[in-house]
Amino acid sequence: MDEIKEEFSFQIFLKIVINNKIIGSVRGYKEKDTCYIGRLIVHPDFQNQGIGIKLMVKIESIFKKVNRFELFIGIKSTKNLYLYQKLGYRPFKTEKLNENLYLTYLEKIIEI
């Protein structure tokens, strides 16, 4: 519980609610000139309806004074990779966590 309280102290959490149920969410925080985005989630019944894009556009607009956005996904998350690339994110690093888990890091640079 303390870990959750700590996350709420420095991160912005966004959610989309339909019929009193959270069907999508994303979080982000700023460190120096970078916004780190995490845990974009959309309920399976509501996927492919633009909700993920709406959440990403909104979180980016909240952190509009940064010059870089960064996030990571599992290397096998091709559907998520496509979504992020549509929004201007580009892979810049792959990290091996163990034999079965690789992460792809993506970034979006904002020209000021």
Placement of each model-derived feature along the sequence:
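Acetyl-CoA-dependent GNAT
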Residues: M1-D45, M56, I62, E95-L97, ...
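Short acidic/polar active-site loop segments enriched in Thr and Asp
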Residues: D33, N67-F69, R90
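Active-site acidic-Proline motif in GNAT/NAT acetyltransferases
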Residues: H43-D45, Q49, K76
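Accessory recognition modules or surfaces
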Residues: I53, F69, L103-E111
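Conserved active-site alpha-helix within GNAT-family acetyltransferase domains
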Residues: I53-K54, S61, K76-T94
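Conserved GNAT acetyl-CoA-binding A-motif
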Residues: M56, I62-G74
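Conserved beta-strand-loop-alpha-helix junction that forms the acyl-donor binding cleft
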Residues: E70-L81, L97-L101
